[in-house]
Amino acid sequence: MARKTPIERYRNIGISAHIDAGKTTTSERILFYTGVTHKLGEVHDGAATTDWMEQEQERGITITSSAVTCFWKGMDLSRPEHRINIIDTPGHVDFTIEVERSMRVLDGACMVYCAVGGVQPQSETVWRQANKHKVPRLAFVNKMDRTGANFFKVVEQMKLRLQANPVPVVIPIGAEDNFAGVVDLIKMKAIYWDDASQGMKFEYKDIPADLLDTANEWREKMVESAAEASEELMNKYLESGELSEAEIIAGLRQRTIATEIQPMLCGSAFKNKGVQRMLDAVLDFLPSPVDIPDVVGESESGEPLTRKADDNEHFSALAFKLMSDPFVGQLTFVRVYSGVLTKGETVYNSTSGRKERIGRIVQMSANERNEIEEIRAGDIAACIGLKEVTTGETLCSIDHPIILERMVFPEPVISVAIEPKTKSDQEKMGLALSRLAQEDPSFRVRTDEETNQTIISGMGELHLEIIVDRMKREFNVEANVGAPQVAYREAIKKPVEVEGKFVKQSGGKGQYGHVWIKMEPNEPGKGYEFIDQIKGGTVPREFIPAVDKGLRETIPSGVLAGFPVVDVKVTLFDGSYHDVDSNENAFKMAASMAFKDGMRKADPVLLEPIMAVEVETPEDYMGDVMGDLSSRRGVIQGMDDLVGGGKAIRAEVPLSEMFGYATTVRSLTQGRATYSMEFKHYAEAPRNVAEAIINKK
């Protein structure tokens, strides 16, 4: 089966934005203009195609990244057909993990900003993630029809807040109620869309006289940006003062893919204006799978390997998302980097070392699925029938294994105890939770050994609320949820050397294990590190793994209040053994005893999670908000002015002080402030706080 669309005409893009920038409405319009949906779904009515989980439709926010495939021939239908795979990513800070995982498989992104709200804190988080993965992107300023809309202010904000380099390729004609269309700076024509056809039809007209100077000024900036792409273009521009349409597009494309600039467009998705021109920009400026560097991985023995985006290469793909579907069971979304995969084939999961058979392959268009025979390099699709695959694992051909770089998922910072309302639901709840944990790696489930309660952990209160909600809807399990608990940690402050000796003589074979270890603080975020420095066989080789195991088993419960110990380096440097009585268990016990003793002597401290909090508030309430944050042991980091008045206050606050903050901030500001928070780092808890926690235990 030949490829319908050449890979050069593929675009794998994400649409990413702050919560209310109108991202889902923008995605909807894309699907409407590309002919995937025939009726426009509005988030306002809770009927958007890409928001297909019930909670998303109720809450009007997007939680999971749906992957949708559509085709576009250009606004004037004059181009060859391009295939666009869109991943709609959530904007809420509790779902940052979803953004992170979709950035990994995208080739380009379209950032949607609100013309009134501008660049908001969540946009900065997403921007940082896109920088980290070097994702080329363009910006779309939406909601130009709203009161207070200001396109040029958002351009300035992108420079200030994101250190971006935005290059407008269109500018708006009018704003607010008078927003009529856009000026295309490449063609130097005004574009007006026809309301009766819901924006399907449009016409080019001359630029309104009062906008001509502004248009010329911005066109010059754009042409200069394009000319900087190469010496050849720069020389031509300096000689003639002009570049052709094709040269401008080529220059801007080259610099966008190199992440040096971000082309900028604007419109109003709700009023059916501007999204069509943005789709053209996706074709013009964002890369196809061939335009970006080859994907990098390693062989099973650790040598670096690359794979070209080519059907003739060996097959490699990344499973970037799992979803349980009521009709077909588990859907595994994969991004194919190289080669071809046909349904019914067996592939190799190089991360886990298991073989998997692909049952069926489906292409998703939001919530409809079309079965297909095969997927090729550059495709994004969902596979059915993969039992053992989890998020972030590599699938590849059996004969030519490659392990692509794994995704790194953040540790959860908040936990709650959960129990089913009826005893009969216990088993169902276990099943539901393990299925949800498989889908979402930033969500964890464990059983507390002391209380036998089921504990679920995640990235924030909203994250866990939605998990409990999904359990009820998708698995019919009603649950009671306890008060949120903070994930504290323990660490040591000074190096110590300690010995652990485990000797047991009670008739028959005895037990003997003896170790000397040095414990010292490790760099923050390094975790546990074990170093073997045994010389002259004082601890025999075969028992050294047992020492490491004994330490690992002791680490999950520290000496202060039983919290996991982090960032500790342990060096085994001496010990002794008995020819007959020494065994693995004895050395495991000796290591565990030494570790506990060392913890007590090494100035143990309690660490608490600190959150980066950003509150956007009208100026009148600024003092109250700052006072309240300080009373929560918050440290104010700085303040920014917001577009359209108001302040954004940035602070670092311990998570334990942030429970129920939503209610407080609402009453302090009469509901006019919004806030977001994300995990920043662990820090030592003050003595009085630590004592209270230890005494509670």
Swiss-Prot record:
Location within or outside the cell: Cytoplasm
Coiled-coil portions: none
A Pfam family that the UniProt record links to this protein: GTP_EFTU_D2
Annotated positions binding GTP: 17-24, 88-92, 142-145
Gene3D superfamilies: 3.30.230.10, 3.30.70.240, Elongation Factor G (Translational Gtpase), domain 3, P-loop containing nucleotide triphosphate hydrolases, Translation factors
A Gene Ontology cellular-component term: cytoplasm
Annotated function: Catalyzes the GTP-dependent ribosomal translocation step during translation elongation. During this step, the ribosome changes from the pre-translocational (PRE) to the post-translocational (POST) state as the newly formed A-site-bound peptidyl-tRNA and P-site-bound deacylated tRNA move to the P and E sites, respectively. Catalyzes the coordinated movement of the two tRNA molecules, the mRNA and conformational changes in the ribosome.
Protein name in UniProt: Elongation factor G
Organism whose genome encodes this protein: Methylobacillus flagellatus (strain ATCC 51484 / DSM 6875 / VKM B-1610 / KT)
Upper taxonomic lineage: Bacteria, Pseudomonadati, Pseudomonadota, Betaproteobacteria, Nitrosomonadales
